[in-house]
Swiss-Prot record:
Protein's cellular compartments: Nucleus
A single GO BP: cell fate commitment
Biological function: Transcriptional activator. Binds to the consensus sequence 5'-AGATAG-3'.
Residue ranges, compositional bias (Basic residues): 257-266
Feature: compositional bias, Low complexity: 14-35, 58-73, 275-296
Signal peptide (UniProt feature, chain positions): none
Organism taxonomic ancestry: Eukaryota, Metazoa, Chordata, Craniata, Vertebrata
Protein name according to UniProt: Transcription factor GATA-4
Source organism (scientific name): Gallus gallus
Tissue: More abundant in heart, with lower levels detected in ovary and small intestine.
Keyword Transcription regulation: yes
Transmembrane segment boundaries: none
PROSITE patterns xref list: GATA_ZN_FINGER_1 (PS00344), GATA_ZN_FINGER_2 (PS50114)
Gene Ontology molecular function, alphabetical: DNA binding; DNA-binding transcription factor activity, RNA polymerase II-specific; RNA polymerase II cis-regulatory region sequence-specific DNA binding; zinc ion binding
Domain of life: Eukaryota
Gene: GATA4
Amino acid sequence: PVYVPTTRVPSMLPSLPYLPSSGSSQQASPVSSHSIWTQPGAESAAYNPGSSHPPVSPRFSFSTSTPIPSTSSRDAAAAYSSSLSLSANGREQYSRGFGSSYSSPYPAYVSPEMATTWTSSPFDSPMLHNLQSRGTPAAARHANIEFFDDYSEGRECVNCGAMSTPLWRRDGTGHYLCNACGLYHKMNGINRPLFKPQRRLSASRRVGLSCANCHTTTTTLWRRNAEGEPVCNACGLYMKLHGVPRPLAMRKEGIQTRKRKPKNLNKTKTPAGPSSSESLTPTTSSTSSSSSATTTEEMRPIKTEPGLSSHYGHPSPISQAFSVSAMSGHGSSIHPAISALKLSPQAYQSAISQSPQASSKQDSWNSLVLAENHGDIITA
């Protein structure tokens, strides 16, 4: 569809063939759609006098700028049909009468100069002519491939003499190298050796070997010294660690292996807990010196849980509740109780919870003092 702005209409009025030449100031309404799809009824109704333009196509609607002045419908129809019969740009096969359902789109509404620019073939462009004037690209491409094939036939690796390779490379002087030699030279900085590296000696080839230092023939691992001579594992490790040859006096007939622990040692070994004689039984010595030494050793603060401090009623350590004289007098009986408390505070807490609680906060300590006076031993 072609939309003509109202500002350009006055300059196009002389070139429109279907308008009368009486000089009446008319303005063409904007065309809504391509007139080739319009029906004859819609075209005849579009030029009724005294009415505004209805939409040319029922699919689109545009408002007109000014209504057409009252002219005879026959004159307008005759002028329009005569314009359709013009053979503009040699298109007689597309021009039909007014009563036909198809009409030529551009000469009726647009000037011939504009119509020729818009109705030109999409292939009539200078770009197409330039593409056609150029040679066929396929032929040039095949020619280049053949040229490179001919040029690459004479290549040869200057190191190993290979004639074919997935990728040709060059060394520092510009000579061609195959992919393997080029990569080796790039990574190591030297030319790739032409012979394959020697494989490790098999078991049959190691039969006649002997250590160059101790002259043994049995070893778990053969090594080489600085001169490249084969040495046994012991001599090689000794030389590596100490920097001097291994003395011949250290030679042994058998191979000394590392004493490794068996894998099932942890499964067969039973866990050894704290001995009951060390933690729960009192000391057998009855001398005062041993009793006083044990008492001073056990005067260290007992580590308890934070929740037990509120049960005791005072933040001071348990060792401060007893005097040195009281503990020294009953060292044989108080020692196992304190050691039991130090080793297992949870067990002592359970023992305290089982004892009857009185209104006083220090009833648990009173029961401990009573048990101590009677010579009883509190066990977990």
